[in-house]
Amino acid sequence: ILPLGFDHILFVLSLFLLSPKLKPVLWQSLAFTIAHSVTLGLAMYHVIKPTQKIVEPVIALSIMYVALENIFSPRLRASRIGVVFCFGLVHGMGFASALSSLGLPSNSYLTSLVMFNVGVELGQLTVILTAWFLLAKWFGNKPYYHKYIVIPLSALIAAIALYWAIQRIF
């Protein structure tokens, strides 16, 4: 997800913050991966033609939404996985732009798609496990976790995402 995946990293961190236990965040990560794989594949095979002028600001707004949900919701809701899946569909369209800019020959789309998704998933798992070890393992069950860790970090992520959204719109 590096060097150009900072928006992706912030999205995954936002998912993690409200889900300091590994199982819920791994399910969200899986839903996100399945969703972005679908739209990435459809875009790579020209079934859909996403407009990056729309997709890129929506990606930034999706990061902001999840970060704000972290701030205003004291706990993970069951609907979160559906929201993450929907946002994954949008992120897949953004990934398609990045992958297609590499100029891949059409006979290697499937292999490239599979390898790209494996790489993205490994990157997501690395971000999740690192965040879990640095934050949740030590502080995730503390009474102050939401107030002093989730809210400030989510506010920072939301502010960055808002900046990106404005930048991508204008």
Region roles according to the model:
Residues I1-F170:
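Membrane metalloprotein/metal-transporter helix-bundle signature
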